[in-house]
Regions:
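Alpha-helical transmembrane segments of multi-pass membrane proteins
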Residues: 1, 30-34, 42-75, 85-86
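Alpha-helical transmembrane segments and their helix-entry boundary regions
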Residues: 21-22, 80-87, 111-112
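Junctions where cytoplasmic loops transition into the N-terminal start of transmembrane alpha-helices
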Residues: 24-33, 154, 177
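Interfacial/gating helices of multi-pass transporter permease domains
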Residues: 1, 146-150, 174-177
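Helix-terminus/linker motif at the lipid-water interface of multi-pass membrane proteins
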Residues: 162-177
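Interhelical loop/hinge segments that connect adjacent transmembrane helices in multipass membrane
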Residues: 125-159
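Hydrophobic alpha-helical transmembrane segments
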Residues: 87-132
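Transmembrane-helix boundary and interhelical linker motifs in polytopic inner-membrane proteins
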Residues: 2-27
Length: 177
């Protein structure tokens, strides 16, 4: 829902050379995604009769995926493709090594945890990349929300894309199978 408007905001700030607004908008958009999405997903998992460990790791993975999705919008400006690829390979390496270790140790949720570790490593790597590239400060700026007024069609398009991407899953949830 946010990604197209945030992408437009980042593109405009880069064009206007307002680089100091980039990191604060990343923190603010990430916070909004997590504040809105995490409780909803946690409730869904709890209602799906999942164990506490599965709910905890599911919520952790959800948060990591939200942040990775968001940070990739910001990474498009960096054009440091070798460093970005290193982040993906880091995730693969951490996931494979910790997954094999969990199999060897016969851990019940080991594979799930290894995926969380892999995405977490990639997330931290990518956030570090945008911090290295853009002027860093730890403030949040919700200035990008003004772009929802100006580019409401982008927000609608983002919603339609989201529905289209996940419609088949929702149909399966409520279908007879």
């Amino acid at each position: 829902l946010f990604s197209l408007v945030v992408t437009r905001f980042v593109a405009d700030m880069l064009y206007e050379k307002k680089f100091e607004t980039i990191i604060p908008s990343f923190y603010a958009s990430s916070a909004l995604m997590l504040i809105i999405g995490t409780p909803l997903y946690a409730i869904y998992l709890a209602l799906a009769s999942r164990s506490l460990a599965e709910v905890a790791m599911g919520v952790l993975l959800f948060g990591e995926l939200c942040l990775v999705w968001n940070v990739i919008t910001y990474l498009t400006a960096i054009k440091s493709y070798k460093e970005i690829i290193k982040g993906f390979f880091l995730a693969i390496g951490v996931t494979v090594v910790s997954g094999l270790l969990s199999i060897f140790l016969h851990q019940k949720y080991g594979i799930f945890l290894s995926v969380c570790l892999g995405y977490g490593g990639m997330m931290f790597w990518m956030v570090r990349l945008i911090h290295d590239y853009f002027p860093s400060n730890l403030k949040m700026s919700f200035e990008f929300l003004k772009w929802f007024d100006q580019f409401s069609d982008l927000a609608k398009t983002g919603l339609y894309m989201l529905v289209a991407l996940f419609a088949h899953i929702i149909i399966n949830w409520f279908g007879p199978i």
